[in-house]
């Protein structure tokens, strides 16, 4: 076999391969000899069919079976000789086999970039020392109260206020005729100021006293996501039927009992505080990681295989589709598409691929391995997050070896990041003043469903 390697880039190569005609002839002889043992042709005894007859009848099938075999053997030989660190699979256009001639073809491959040793020691890092406060705990409890609030009809005669809910009927009309894209809706409960209906609804309803009928004009933009309404002026005939107030439950042990997970208010507060602390720990780790890769990627330049970027993109798109699917929504329903997301997030995907390459280099460079204790701790953490047993997690990985190897590699990447932080120059700093609190109420409420 003759092999010439064309270097398209540091990560792209084309293997120009030629299998001598003598080797092709031997493989054809073997193929026809095997075929001769089983082939049946009218007028000839099995095993006695002449080669010419076999070629006339079966050459297309023989060539179709033999070419992939020859290509695979040649590719395997090239890999054995040159030890390419492949990324993804090879790309090859199946060549056409002609008896008496050599078989020539090209195989395109992508390989991991070869990096010099990564100097990661002494990176200057700022570690923000976040601290969960009682005020944040109280804010989370207020959020829980809102999720458990009830609505009651306002019996006194008064105008609609900002924090009210309203019970309305409405129907859209265009040029005096009912609009199919804005059909009649009855007994709809809307929060004043919400975006579930056009903003004009809240503006017009605010200050109104039920029962009251009114017209609300809404001018839809030409590029509105609802094509049936885009560019139209719709007059909604609205009936304000009643005002409803949100009634928040008191902060006491009864509130906690209704959550169904905690024994008393103190236990709930402790759980919220614990979630806040965990959230801050994750935030700190994320910020340190961002600083690490900003530093390393500025100092180390290398090409990234398209295959890796495409794989990261597919992961991003799959996550987006899954997130929308949880609400029975497709990408197309919100004006998105896979092609749009591929364009929008390609830079993010390339950045993620670069991180994996750098961490992979550091893992090899430092001979990092997972200890049994680290692996067991990882299983326990995953089991806790899945609300499952450790044995269930282990059994899952036993059934899928590829998932286990992927999991181990992600744990090794985390270990590499911890090593970089340990050997970095870390300065502790106070957090900047923020108006928003960390999200942990959702975590607490998730437990109530378990």
Swiss-Prot record:
Enzyme type, top EC level: isomerase
Enzyme Commission code(s) on record: 5.2.1.8
Keyword Acyltransferase included in the entry's annotation: no
A GO molecular function held by the record: protein folding chaperone
Compartment(s): Cytoplasm
Coiled coil: none
Keyword set, alphabetical order: Cell cycle, Cell division, Chaperone, Cytoplasm, Isomerase, Rotamase
Primary localization class, coarse: cytoplasm
InterPro entries: PPIase_dom_sf (IPR046357), Trig_fac (IPR005215), Trigger_fac_C (IPR008880), Trigger_fac_C_sf (IPR037041), Trigger_fac_ribosome-bd_bac (IPR008881), Trigger_fac_ribosome-bd_sf (IPR036611), Trigger_fact/SurA_dom_sf (IPR027304)
GO biological process, one term: cell division
Pfam families according to UniProt: Trigger_C, Trigger_N
Region of interest: Disordered: 431-450
Entry annotated with the keyword Cell cycle: yes
UniProt biased composition (Acidic residues): 431-443
Catalytic activity annotation: [protein]-peptidylproline (omega=180) = [protein]-peptidylproline (omega=0)
Residues in PPIase FKBP-type domain copies: 163-249
Single GO cellular component term: cytoplasm
Family statement drawn from the similarity comment of this UniProt entry: Belongs to the FKBP-type PPIase family. Tig subfamily.
HAMAP family xref list: Trigger_factor_Tig
Role summary: Involved in protein export. Acts as a chaperone by maintaining the newly synthesized protein in an open conformation. Functions as a peptidyl-prolyl cis-trans isomerase.
Full protein name: Trigger factor
Natural source organism: Desulforapulum autotrophicum (strain ATCC 43914 / DSM 3382 / VKM B-1955 / HRM2)
Phylogenetic lineage: Bacteria, Pseudomonadati, Thermodesulfobacteriota, Desulfobacteria, Desulfobacterales
